[in-house]
Swiss-Prot record:
Oligomeric form and interacting partners: Heterotrimer of UreA (gamma), UreB (beta) and UreC (alpha) subunits. Three heterotrimers associate to form the active enzyme.
Lineage summary: Bacteria, Pseudomonadati, Pseudomonadota, Alphaproteobacteria, Rhodobacterales
Record's keyword annotation contains Cytoplasm: yes
Record-listed E.C. numbers: 3.5.1.5
Family classification: Belongs to the urease beta subunit family.
UniProt keyword annotations, A-Z: Cytoplasm, Hydrolase
Pathway(s) it belongs to: Nitrogen metabolism; urea degradation; CO(2) and NH(3) from urea (urease route): step 1/1
Subcellular locations according to the entry: Cytoplasm
Major place of residence: cytoplasm
Protein name (record): Urease subunit beta
Annotated GO MF terms: urease activity
Record has Protease as a keyword: no
Length: 101
């Protein structure tokens, strides 16, 4: 083995395959772009984003870690969300949960 060498797995790797998923329509009703990162608790995003926040409780974007989705002013798009795993506790963000989901 060489330091830093990577041994990739064979075949396709499916991200979030076993997690509960939901698809929501999201509109940016604001006058500025809103960008949401991959692991942000989607129900607590910017209030300018219009969508079913209760359906998004305990969910995050189903995109690769470290990436984000940008919503331009007036833009409407569908997004797929996946449930948080592990202890299913949410702290920080906008402070609306601060504990178990």
């Amino acid at each position: 083995m060489i330091p830093g060498e990577i041994f990739p797995a064979e075949g396709e790797i499916l991200l979030n395959a076993e997690r509960m998923q939901v698809t929501l329509v999201v509109s940016n009703a604001g006058d500025r772009p809103v960008q949401v990162g991959s692991h942000y608790h989607f129900a607590e995003t910017n209030p300018a984003l219009d969508f079913d926040r209760e359906a998004a409780r305990g969910m995050r974007l189903d995109i690769p870690a470290g990436t984000a989705v940008r919503f331009e002013p007036g833009q409407t798009r569908e997004v797929r969300l996946v449930s948080y795993a592990g202890a299913r506790e949410v702290y920080g963000f906008n402070g609306r949960i601060m504990g178990k989901l």
